[in-house]
Amino acid sequence: MGTRSLTGENTMSNKTPFMYAISLGLALTPICFSTVSAQERCKVSEESSAAKSSYTQQHVMDVGDIPGHQIRVFELHRTYPNDKPNCQNLKRTETWEHGYSDYVDRNGRAWGYSVISLENGDKIFAQFDGTSQTTVAPDGSKKSTFTGVTRYIGGTGKYQSVQGLFKTNVVFDPDKNMNQAQNEGEYWLPASTVGQSQK
């Protein structure tokens, strides 16, 4: 390009800085988006204690095709008296879960919906889906575990457009009204809601 400018091609010479500016801008754009995206993501590792979780409703129906095949509809309530603040400095107060299970001897698929309430009144809506497995010990006692995925799909207030993805592990026993959950993952908010003051 230096040789051309010396031969009198001023038009090309004048365009050169402009073209460099465009190229530099295009090169930096993905870096800027990546930085903003990383700032908006919140890592989560949380536990829901069995002592503060209880099945408030359960309806079980025998399918009748093979022994032990049952369809169940359930409602689960969780409270969080000693919860840790999230990335917006808000604590959970309670969660209501409404779900379904399709089990044979407590093995099979379970899925449903959650509504998580925060201390400022905002709510987060979630879906969960996964598989339960039950092992029977020599003494006849059972241990049931659920492994699946929980997704944040929206909410209210600053969480209206929240999205999230979590690995969920649950140890449960519906007969003993016991349910203890562990979630690992992250959620993110649109840039327009980050930094908003609490309601």
For each feature predicted by the language model, list its residue ranges.
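Short, Lys/Arg-enriched N-terminal segments with co-localized hydrophobic residues
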Residues: M1-T11
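Intrinsic disorder/low-complexity detector
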Residues: G8, N14, S34, Y55-Q58
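Bacterial N-terminal signal peptides that target proteins for export
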Residues: S13-I22
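Bacterial N-terminal signal peptides
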Residues: A21-C32
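Beta-strand-enriched cores of mature, soluble protein domains
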Residues: S37-K199
